[in-house]
Design a protein with these regions (language model features):
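Short regulatory helix/loop adjacent to the ATP-binding pocket of P-loop NTPases
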Residues: 1-9, 23-24
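Accessory nucleic acid-recognition modules appended to NTPase machines
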Residues: 51-206
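Conserved small helical "lid"/interfacial subdomain of P-loop NTPases
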Residues: 11-29
């Protein structure tokens, strides 16, 4: 049984390679990537042609599987609060998360939520595999940090279900995170003084470092993305992943086009 047929038996998203397989796409283009970023990899959605049909499918999936599964399993009483928390995580995917920021968001809507309830609901959402949490790691101090983590959606289609803005950079980062997880890596967000490295991916005691950006528009962008590794003193591989088709590799840091990287080329 092929990988995509096996996955079609359960509501788990395809990765990019599997999404191409089910669509019989041999030579993917940027348009295929954007379609995946926007609508995600849920197997059933590839049988739908119209954007309105795909959005309705994702909305129904969100209501019937995500919300109802969590509500039933954990006996959640405040369903509307749970929904708003999930929507907040969807709209802020790939951003640093803090309890105060989501509390301010909820208060702006006239909602009260204790820290205990908030963290319980967050844990329920993570346990449901709707989102995954990436802790921060202090590269200089060599220790994991317990606050200001990031959350990534298991499927990017949910991020664009209710949002009016399509943040390509955030979705690319989300897809790279999911791909690293699917490849068996433990993934953390790297912290060096006042800067950040998107991902430290560890497997079998070996590390790889990743910066993810949409495009390397100018010298400032190139300097920022490649300069993120300056504080890293080890010799493990370092990658900058973007949608560019020109190779900007420099100083031992490897630049990869995201489609090539996702296809493991």
């Amino acid at each position: 049984m092929s990988s995509f047929v096996a996955k079609a038996l359960q509501p788990s998203p395809f990765n990019f390679t599997e999404s191409l397989e089910i669509q019989n796409i041999q030579n993917p283009t940027d348009s295929d990537l954007m379609n995946y970023l926007k609508f995600g990899g849920m197997p059933q959605r590839f049988y739908l042609k119209e954007e309105s049909e795909i959005k309705k499918f994702l909305s129904d999936l969100y209501d019937s599987i995500v919300l109802k599964d969590i509500v039933t399993r954990y006996k959640v009483k405040n369903i509307e609060l749970l929904s708003r928390i999930i929507n907040y995580l969807s709209s802020t995917s790939s951003q640093i998360f803090s309890a105060s920021s989501i509390n301010n968001f909820l208060k702006s809507e006239g909602r009260d939520c204790s820290k205990e309830t908030l963290y319980n609901y967050l844990d329920y959402v993570v346990q449901s595999c709707t989102v995954n949490k990436a802790k921060r790691y202090d590269i200089t101090g060599k220790k994991s940090l317990s606050t200001l983590e990031k959350y990534y959606l298991s499927d990017t289609g949910f991020a664009n279900l209710y949002s009016t803005k399509f943040n390509i950079g955030a979705m690319l980062e989300n897809v790279v995170f999911n791909e690293l997880i699917s490849r068996g890596y433990d993934v953390q967000v790297g912290v060096t003084n006042n800067s950040e490295i998107d991902f430290i991916a560890t497997k079998n005691n070996l590390k790889e470092y990743f910066q993810v950006s949409y495009l390397l528009f100018d010298e400032n962008t190139i300097s920022r993305e490649f300069g993120a590794f300056k504080k890293v003193k080890d010799n493990f591989p370092k990658y900058v992943i973007t949608a560019d088709h020109f190779d900007f590799s420099q100083d031992g840091i490897i630049h990869k086009n995201i489609i090539d990287w996702l296809l493991d080329k």
